[in-house]
């Protein structure tokens, strides 16, 4: 495993932290830095205290812990506004030494903080990455050992996590095949048999039927395990020879080094006396199995969405998607954001576009024979079936000009949410930094490769923040997710590079290499106008237009050759809640544009003045009644705040190279398609 060296910085807001305090922060505090995903390998690093003044360094040392730590870390954070974050040290680590213990001065509060996020991140204004740390006990200088940590961990946190599925000995193929040489050696030298479960990619016999080779996948990795079953194992061996792709199995045998090319190990099932055995859990009719062929078109796989997770493509996509969801929560949780569950059913249209799915129970009545069996309610007799059938399908108002929603389930019009933003803003204005992450719905009759009717949105809301803060956090989040996938989904990303997009890894590393370009909307339009004769855009470029995908991609792929952030858009093409700039023509909005996709993130500083917000609602010809509570937020302790929304499926497209958004979600919903 490569060494990782980190610098620990204690940072403060320039606005809130006076320089004079820097001298008081020169405390010889000792922190333990957790560095690895699976084991805590701690290396010597440079500790630096940094404030708004010049950085000041003091001596440090490091130590090494062997083996995984089966317990959480108890980090500390200096009392606000002081926070800590990690950044990678360019210097290589030195040999581990003992950590010295220093007394902590009295009066310095060290409350527990959030867990470690061991990733390389820049300082994010007020939003720093949290650091996994532990303060030394007070006392004289002495060696610091893992025992000091163990003594401070509650007993309830030390319980082992049980293993599930196929008995306690089941091994997931990812642990066996993706763990490197050390993992392979561990399983090869194991004295007890190994149990694996999964589905066959292929089954073939050899040696006149004395051997059966099963290529097995369990979905935990893009790699397969070859299982070699000898006829002497007995049992269902004759039935095994009749199996094909798609059958499910449980195999128990020995992991041995494979003589075949392209695979390090295989599972040998050959000796019943050692506990070797196998079980056919589920058979498949090879003639009917939809995935019997090795290659299938993306369109065909969408028609069998219930089986397409078994394909290499969708299996890899879903593993990456799962890791991106994990990265999302890790990023915001480590920065102190609260996760808010916003409603799916709402009465408000966040975008003001009216493209919403309506939720209603005002459906046609059941057939007359059903109505005849109605039970009495509140002393009233059941209606005559003929009279009930003669009623309008949907109740109307007395003047017959509209639907009578007072008889609907919610007593008013209700819709599936198009965004969690409006619902999460009140929590930002009460609990500070928050985020929501969930499904959203748009009734857009769009058949492009970038749009879905049901998709997931990541929507943070940052308290006491400006548009600048918003852009910094959005860029850091995108980079964090890209780095997370490169670190944790390497095998799948390499599969995508081989089978989906050549040069994918280089493109992702380019996202991390430099700061995103920043350009105002007006400047972007001028650049596109200058490029228009060469680019031959389908839509003419002019100020006030809502840039299309061709313009967004041209900026990132041809002009800046990296992601860029466009800000200060015309107010007429943006939503009502965005804060108006001093020029009266533009709003404090921003979009993060990325190669191959175009818009990935859309955000803004929110309008915090009630009168201006009311004027924007009126200018957009929106009914102010559904937004009464949203405007009322501006009457009671209004604050500047900002936020953004990121389409999660587009993020999956970005890191996998998938070209159609319908292949990034388990069950795609788009016009004319809502099966499964």
Which positions does each model-derived feature cover?
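Class II aminoacyl-tRNA synthetase catalytic cores and aaRS-like
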Residues: 29-38, 79, 95-105, 116-676
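N-terminal chloroplast transit peptides
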Residues: 1-109
């Amino acid at each position: 495993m490569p060494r990782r060296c980190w610098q620990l910085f204690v940072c403060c807001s320039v606005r809130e932290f006076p320089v004079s305090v820097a001298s008081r922060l020169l405390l010889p505090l000792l922190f333990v830095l957790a560095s690895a995903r699976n084991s805590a390998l701690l290396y010597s690093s440079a500790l630096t205290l940094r404030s708004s003044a010049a950085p000041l360094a003091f001596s440090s040392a490091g130590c090494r812990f062997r083996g995984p730590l089966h317990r959480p870390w108890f980090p500390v954070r200096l009392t606000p506004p002081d926070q800590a974050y990690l950044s990678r040290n360019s210097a290589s680590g030195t040999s581990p030494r003992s950590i010295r213990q220093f007394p902590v001065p009295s009066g310095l509060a060290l409350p527990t903080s959030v867990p470690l996020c061991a990733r390389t991140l820049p300082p994010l204004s007020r939003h720093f990455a949290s650091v996994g740390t532990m303060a030394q006990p007070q006392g004289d200088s002495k060696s610091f050992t893992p025992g000091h940590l163990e003594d401070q961990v509650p007993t309830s946190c030390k319980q082992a996590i049980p293993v599930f599925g196929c008995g306690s000995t089941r091994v997931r193929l990812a642990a066996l095949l993706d763990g490197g040489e050390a993992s392979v050696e561990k399983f090869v030298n194991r004295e007890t048999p190994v149990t694996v479960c999964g589905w066959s990619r292929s089954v073939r016999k050899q040696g006149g039927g004395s051997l059966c080779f099963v290529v097995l996948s369990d979905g935990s990795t893009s790699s397969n395990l070859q299982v070699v079953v000898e006829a002497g194992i007995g049992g269902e061996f004759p039935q095994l020879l009749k199996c094909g792709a798609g059958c499910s199995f449980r195999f128990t045998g020995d992991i041995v080094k494979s003589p075949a090319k392209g695979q390090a190990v295989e599972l040998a099932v050959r000796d019943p006396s050692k506990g070797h055995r196998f079980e056919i859990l589920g058979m498949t009719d090879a003639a009917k199995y939809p995935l019997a062929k090795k290659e299938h078109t993306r369109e065909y796989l969408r028609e069998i969405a219930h089986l397409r997770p078994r394909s290499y493509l969708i299996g890899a996509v879903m593993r990456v998607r799962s890791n991106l969801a994990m990265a999302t929560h890790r990023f915001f949780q480590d920065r102190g954001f609260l996760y808010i569950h916003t409603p799916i059913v709402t009465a408000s249209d966040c975008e003001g576009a009216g493209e919403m799915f309506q939720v209603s129970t005002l459906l046609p009545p059941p057939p007359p024979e059903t109505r005849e069996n109605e039970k009495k309610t509140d002393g009233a007799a059941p209606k005559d079936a003929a009279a009930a059938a003669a009623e309008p399908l949907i109740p109307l108002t007395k003047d017959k000009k509209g639907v009578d929603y007072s008889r609907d389930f919610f007593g008013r019009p209700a819709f599936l949410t198009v965004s969690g933003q409006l619902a999460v803003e009140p929590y930002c204005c009460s609990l500070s930094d928050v985020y929501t992450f969930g499904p959203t719905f748009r009734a857009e009759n769009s058949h492009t490769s970038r749009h879905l009717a049901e998709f997931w949105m990541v929507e943070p809301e940052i308290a006491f923040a400006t548009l600048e803060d918003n852009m910094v956090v959005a860029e850091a989040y995108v980079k964090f997710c890209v780095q997370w996938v490169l670190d944790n989904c390497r095998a799948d990303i390499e599969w995508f590079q081989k089978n989906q997009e050549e040069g994918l890894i280089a493109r992702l590393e380019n996202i991390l290499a430099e700061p995103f370009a920043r350009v105002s909307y007006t400047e972007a339009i001028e650049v596109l106008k200058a490029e228009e004769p060469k680019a031959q855009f389908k839509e003419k470029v002019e100020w006030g237009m809502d840039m299309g995908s061709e313009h967004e991609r041209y900026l990132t792929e041809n002009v800046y050759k990296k992601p860029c952030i466009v800000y200060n858009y015309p107010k007429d093409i943006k939503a009502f809640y965005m804060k108006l700039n001093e020029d009266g023509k533009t709003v404090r909005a921003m979009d993060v544009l990325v190669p191959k996709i175009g818009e990935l993130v859309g955000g803004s500083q929110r309008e915090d003045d009630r009168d201006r917000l009311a004027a924007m609602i009126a200018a957009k010809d929106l009914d102010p009644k559904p937004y009464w509570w949203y405007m009322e937020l501006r009457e009671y302790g209004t604050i500047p705040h900002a936020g953004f929304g990121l389409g999660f499926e587009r993020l999956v497209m970005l890191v996998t190279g998938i070209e159609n958004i319908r292949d990034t979600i388990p069950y795609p919903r788009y016009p004319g398609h809502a099966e499964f």
